[in-house]
A protein has these predicted regions:
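Catalytic cores of carbohydrate-active enzymes
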Residues: 372, 378-431
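Glycine- and aromatic-rich loop/turn segments at beta-sheet edges
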Residues: 216-235, 275-285, 329-355, 399-419
Length: 431
């Protein structure tokens, strides 16, 4: 956050208005004018770094504020360089997690201080929700380049050198624009109105935001990653931040058509996750997350496999799929299929023991079909027959009287009362 005048900290005290008319929002750049500080702000990004450009007024004191949202932080300033880390997170990480930063300002830093809330102080100790203020010796145009890493400060510096060091804001912006033009240009549409084109390409843009690249290049340029699944640094790729319960039937099917190489790399990353944590993630955020039902990464793998996207460890991926289909996960539901033992025994997930029972039954049946598809492809015919058979368990939710899929109790009875117009009643819907 750029700031001019007296130092103000705390979200409400330091906030500035900006006008839509003064704002440019593109996939590759954000620009606006901060009226309170009479400062033009622009930011562009690379895969692991960002470059901010501030155009300050010449008069008055001016500074850059950097503040993590939550968690303990530590910062150190030396010359025009800043390094540090924050442990802030919203879950899905092991103990010791940190996001490391390395940054440089292309202007002299006349002083620095730490702050928390509205209190300013000096020191280097790790503290909760601590930010850093960099006082700048001159106004005019200033560039602030920031690199991130989940491995270490040294790795953040390596990312800085590889992606933004010595490069102007304009060069980085143009590079980002070229990347986005290429990605969005992979699909050309004809006969659309301008509004339809804007809607289509805005939606296509959003399909490219997640999952996020989690791996980083080591000193030899080979991918490494900090694993949120076991807290260690490993060789290889990793992706993060995506739930599969809806994207398995939308985003990943699209990627299989317009970016099959990247899709294979994503699956290799989640196969690495299974090697490190023991299970495929149900929702990667960035590690295991108990959110939504089913193990739909199984469907992502099967869809890619049958379409020929197989540049990943297929045997290891299949082993993770097989574990999803046959073993009990944890009680929180962050991995494994909830109710899988009852599903195997009864042919459905009983509604008097598990929530979303009809949906779980159909999810498990569908992903059994996906397991069978891969099993058949790699020559595991006995497995294929087993899971093709279990895939028919979806029929056990169908009530011939009401013509709806419904939750069933362990004794075989359908849950009563039945109301097809109420979500999460005895009528369970599934798309």
């Amino acid at each position: 956050m750029p700031q001019v005048g007296d130092m103000l900290t705390g979200n409400e005290r330091q906030a500035s208005v900006f006008r839509r008319a003064d704002t440019v929002i593109k996939p590759y750049v954000f620009e606006t004018f901060l009226g309170r500080y009479q400062t033009q702000l622009a930011v562009t990004a690379t895969e692991r770094c960002a470059c901010f450009r501030f155009r300050f007024p010449q008069e008055s004191a001016r500074r850059i504020l950097l503040q993590p949202l939550v968690g303990a932080s530590w910062f150190q300033v030396s010359g025009n360089r800043l390094e540090g880390f924050t442990r802030g997170n919203s879950g899905g990480v092991p103990p010791g997690f940190a996001c490391y930063i390395y940054a440089e300002v292309d202007a002299d830093i006349s002083g620095s201080s730490l702050f928390s809330g509205e209190q300013s102080f000096h020191g280097e100790s790790e503290s909760e929700q601590v930010g850093v203020a960099l006082e700048l010796a001159q106004g005019g145009e200033v560039s602030f380049r920031v690199a991130t890493s989940f491995v270490s400060i040294d790795q953040a510096r390596r990312n800085f050198d590889a992606e933004v060091k010595g490069r102007s804001f304009e060069a980085l912006r143009d590079q980002s624009q070229a990347i986005w033009d290429e990605r969005l240009g992979r699909i050309q549409i004809e006969g659309a109105t301008q509004i339809q084109r804007e809607t289509f390409y805005s939606c296509l843009y959003r399909t490219q935001l997640f999952p996020r690249i989690w791996h980083e290049p080591d000193e030899g340029g080979q991918p490494i990653h900090y694993s949120p699944y076991d807290g260690e640094v490993h060789k290889g790729v990793l992706y993060a931040d995506n739930g599969f319960w809806d994207t398995h039937r939308t985003v990943y099917s699209l990627l299989s058509l317009i970016d099959p190489e990247r899709l294979s790399e994503m699956i290799e990353g989640w196969t690495n996750a299974a090697k490190e944590g023991g299970w495929f993630p149900k929702w990667s955020s960035p590690g295991y997350r108990a959110c939504m039902i089913g193990t739909h990464l199984d469907a992502v793998v099967a869809d890619a496999y049958v379409k020929g996207c197989r540049d990943f460890d297929v045997e290891a991926a299949y082993a993770a799929m097989l574990r999803d289909a046959t073993e009990v996960g944890n009680a929180e539901g962050s991995f494994g299929r909830t109710g899988i033992e009852a599903f195997e025994q009864l042919g459905y997930v009983p509604a008097d023991e598990f929530d979303h029972a009809a949906s779980r039954t159909m999810d498990h049946a569908y992903t059994d079909y996906c397991v069978a598809q891969v099993a058949s492809g790699i020559g595991r015919q006995e497995d294929a027959r087993r899971f093709y058979g279990r895939a028919l368990n979806y029929r056990n939710t169908f009530d011939p009287k009401t013509k709806f899929a419904r939750g069933r109790n362990r004794d075989g009875s359908f849950v009563e009362p039945f109301n097809e117009f109420r979500i999460n009643s005895s009528y369970e819907f599934h798309i």
